[in-house]
């Protein structure tokens, strides 16, 4: 028979690490939706057919003395510290990871706070080194990750900002780079490809096309600068004349000089 959430919590306390796989805490949340006890909202959502609203949590149960009480950081009976960090808005209990509550995001973020700023247009907290250096897309954090199709805004996984402005979970971004280099939404290069383009320049120069293709040109569309240009066809890649990127797509048929038709 499966262990209850309370039994799981007590067992975790006895074994050392408290809480669940998601959070280190010494209390259980009483779900306002179904009155069941769970270590966290994620554990609840995995086991139920509805979601726990973190903002509506009113009560917690101490996993040490089992006292059911008003949500707070320390047990009113046995003084057990429920979490090194506690947010009275999100009802988040966890180890101290220098978290902070962002009023604009509406939830807690892992800090430190001074290393982040809230971009009002993207509607997301970003690292300060991206201030004025990222492409804004309105409410981009409210879109699901195009790789896993899961939520980004409230995810515990860090978001990665692509040069095009779109967001991916950092873990999804790392997996994507194993298969390709382009944003799955707009096909813009997801990282600086300059070094690879220079290598491709060398390969193209060292790989002449057969004589029947040497004067063939094609119209191309660049996925990086969105420019159009007409270039010589090459099987290894066709380089944008405007930004030198090889992240291009053929935009029309091949053109053969009249004297070769």
Curated annotation (Swiss-Prot):
GO terms for biological process: positive regulation of proteasomal ubiquitin-dependent protein catabolic process; positive regulation of protein ubiquitination; protein autoubiquitination; protein ubiquitination; rescue of stalled ribosome; ubiquitin-dependent protein catabolic process. SUPFAM superfamilies: CHY zinc finger-like, RING/U-box, Zinc hairpin stack. Keywords: Cytoplasm, Metal-binding, Nucleus, Transferase, Ubl conjugation, Ubl conjugation pathway, Zinc, Zinc-finger. Zn(2+) 1 binds at residues 20, 22, 40, 43. Zn(2+) 6 binds at residues 119, 122, 134, 136. Zn(2+) 5 binds at residues 102, 105, 118, 125. InterPro entries: RCHY1_zinc-ribbon (IPR039512), Znf_CHY (IPR008913), Znf_CHY_sf (IPR037274), Znf_CTCHY (IPR017921), Znf_CTCHY_sf (IPR037275), Znf_RING (IPR001841), Znf_RING/FYVE/PHD (IPR013083). A zinc finger (CTCHY-type) spans 82-144. It is found in: Nucleus; Nucleus speckle; Cytoplasm. Induction: Up-regulated upon p53/TP53 activation. Disulfide bonds: none annotated. Zn(2+) 2 binds at residues 33-34, 44, 50. Detected in testis, liver, kidney and heart. It catalyses: S-ubiquitinyl-[E2 ubiquitin-conjugating enzyme]-L-cysteine + [acceptor protein]-L-lysine = [E2 ubiquitin-conjugating enzyme]-L-cysteine + N(6)-ubiquitinyl-[acceptor protein]-L-lysine. It holds the Pfam family zf-CHY. Its EC number is 2.3.2.27. Zn(2+) 4 binds at residues 87, 90, 101, 108. Monomer and homodimer. Interacts with AR, MDM2, KAT5, PLAG1, PLAGL2, COPE, UBE2D2 and GORAB/NTKLBP1. This is RING finger and CHY zinc finger domain-containing protein 1.
